Amino acid sequence: MELVDTLFASLSGTDPFTGVDITIANCKSTYWDEGIVQQLINQVLDEGEKFAGAAGLEGLSRYDVTLNIGLTSSNVWPGFSLDTATISRLCACGADFGFDLYISDVPDVQCDLNTTNDFTVQFTAMLNPDERVIIAKRPLKKCDAWIEDVYIFQVFKEAWQFQNDNSLRGFRDKQAELKLYARHYSVENCTEESCWDCNYCIRPRFSLSRSAIIRLNAANARFVYQPFTRDQRARG
């Protein structure tokens, strides 16, 4: 566990009767570990379920809800994963999901992909008991914030074609996984001459639209956010 400056999960939406934006639930933590994001998400969803009453999580969909995670800290590796049960709960309430972070002095982590791209979206599944296969992969050269949802859709589209039935349900028993690789820069290693705002490089925030979450749930897939700071070393 590592102490952080700010870490919170917020569930917000729009009142269907008044049109007023409201905060439904808010949970905070003073520390970071790889499981804390999933824990905070489920805590705010528990509070949201209480708010919705008898209608349960499904009742939150009328509020057009968004679940945001905010993180500000230093020297923290901000990788995390969401299991299929958490994805299912996000799907039930029709939520969009966003992760906004500011990490100074990100620990040095090598990407486990052979890539020079800043973002890569990858969908994999266990087609054989001992073999994880890349079903679809899309690279994004630069950290263009919030564009990754287009690439996620394209990855799912390729996965539909893989199954030949325009469905993701064929992956439900294949331990499917959607992984987002994201490069983190620091002031020290940023080499982009056109860079005028360091926040642009060292805040590779992202979002998952409700349609992406619905597709994750259809495939019974987990989600993994895998940040890194450097490419694989050249192999001699």
Outline where the language-model segments fall:
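Acidic (Asp/Glu-rich) sequence patches and key acidic residues
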Residues: 1-219, 226, 232-236
